[in-house]
Amino acid sequence: MDLIPNFAMETWVLVATSLVLLYIYGTHSHKLFKKLGIPGPTPLPFLGTILFYLRGLWNFDRECNEKYGEMWGLYEGQQPMLVIMDPDMIKTVLVKECYSVFTNQMPLGPMGFLKSALSFAEDEEWKRIRTLLSPAFTSVKFKEMVPIISQCGDMLVRSLRQEAENSKSINLKDFFGAYTMDVITGTLFGVNLDSLNNPQDPFLKNMKKLLKLDFLDPFLLLISLFPFLTPVFEALNIGLFPKDVTHFLKNSIERMKESRLKDKQKHRVDFFQQMIDSQNSKETKSHKALSDLELVAQSIIIIFAAYDTTSTTLPFIMYELATHPDVQQKLQEEIDAVLPNKAPVTYDALVQMEYLDMVVNETLRLFPVVSRVTRVCKKDIEINGVFIPKGLAVMVPIYALHHDPKYWTEPEKFCPERFSKKNKDSIDLYRYIPFGAGPRNCIGMRFALTNIKLAVIRALQNFSFKPCKETQIPLKLDNLPILQPEKPIVLKVHLRDGITSGP
């Protein structure tokens, strides 16, 4: 039996030509870095270097740093990406030329109305939205929100107390995830959710669906391999985020706005109210006000960004404190000194706690939740002798930067003293960037730090955390794009001196 089909010569020529053209398309952009003299891993047709991400972005970036130095080239499907770790180049990309030459990160794919969110808006649109949102992220506004966050901290203490009294080991993500969700709904929408005790709440269920975006989803990989399909999916109203979820949240947020416009007597300090107020603020004289759809987009992206940062960082902090009891004790002593007799947390108290700041900074160095920050070049430029053509993505590998042994002594060691007043000045500003850097850094940085610190204070005022048999030591990281432990962080929670205070 003949295994090779008996096609006419013309058919074979057509098949061969099609395969050659397909190969050319799948590799046409993969010669750029060789042409520029920039090293990097060998890309595969169509896939580029994306399969290496299965090892974990954080791990792959560190391996590349060890092999290629402070600069290398990658290919996300067809998209070339220059990776830089030199502090001067990072400063130029993120600060000096952040407006004139570079714009926001590449869109992930078909975003629908979410493309107007601050994280994805470009150039003048980004400036307009950032200007309108900035007043909501000032120290004055955070002071007003501390009582809301404190209420969430009280609910966290109540939940942890039940586990401590029953001598149970706890999955920290369950408790700090619930705390984070309560903070988001409380500070964003003024809604008291108590998510740990109300898991079936429709608003909560839809927010959790929103947060399940899988960066290795086949649909997302398809967009990476064939970026020209993005406009097609946009036209078909197919997006990255589940349509039923965005539709539910959009309708819910619109109803909230209508309700608030009718009830003008109540004074509210949450982010949503401040975005509504911005639609009629003085800033709108020089900047077009947020549309209702843009207001919804900002609300959804705040949910998305705030949840991962806080709910992931808090378990990492508690793990390090549990495995470094001397650090935990020293931090508890500082908390007790600034807030004696388990006094309520204030914004001024947060600012005073130097050792708490050191612990949080060191944890974010070891475990930056977002392991990369990306910009896109708008025009040809040469930086430090390196030619960067228009359209090229430029990426800073934050995890690799924070773990580079050339700049950090024993980079895998948890050492809060790195960030003491004595040592902090010696740290290069562009070697430690857990929230990015420059004008386009994370607008919610101080908000996230406030949430994290308040939770740590309330927890350590009342409890001590210790490893148990389920605790993975040493901690291993998963291969997900957003930094996560391989296994849930499980610890034993103990009442301090057998007593607790609070609600």
Curated annotation (Swiss-Prot):
Its EC number is 1.14.14.1. Induction: By rifampicin. This is Cytochrome P450 3A43. One of its GO terms (biological process) is cytochrome metabolic process. Chimeric transcripts, characterized by CYP3A43 exon 1 joined at canonical splice sites to distinct sets of CYP3A4 or CYP3A5 exons, have been detected. All are possibly produced by trans-splicing. CYP3A43-CYP3A4 chimeric transcripts exist in 3 different combinations: CYP3A43 exon 1 joined in frame to CYP3A4 exons 2-13, CYP3A43 exon 1 joined in frame to CYP3A4 exons 4-13 and CYP3A43 exon 1 joined in frame to CYP3A4 exon 7-13. The lineage of its organism: Eukaryota, Metazoa, Chordata, Craniata, Vertebrata. It comes from the Eukaryota. Heme binds at residue 442. It is a peripheral membrane protein. The gene is CYP3A43. SUPFAM superfamilies: Cytochrome P450. PROSITE patterns: CYTOCHROME_P450. GO terms for molecular function: estrogen 16-alpha-hydroxylase activity; heme binding; iron ion binding; monooxygenase activity; testosterone 6-beta-hydroxylase activity. It is found in: Endoplasmic reticulum membrane; Microsome membrane.
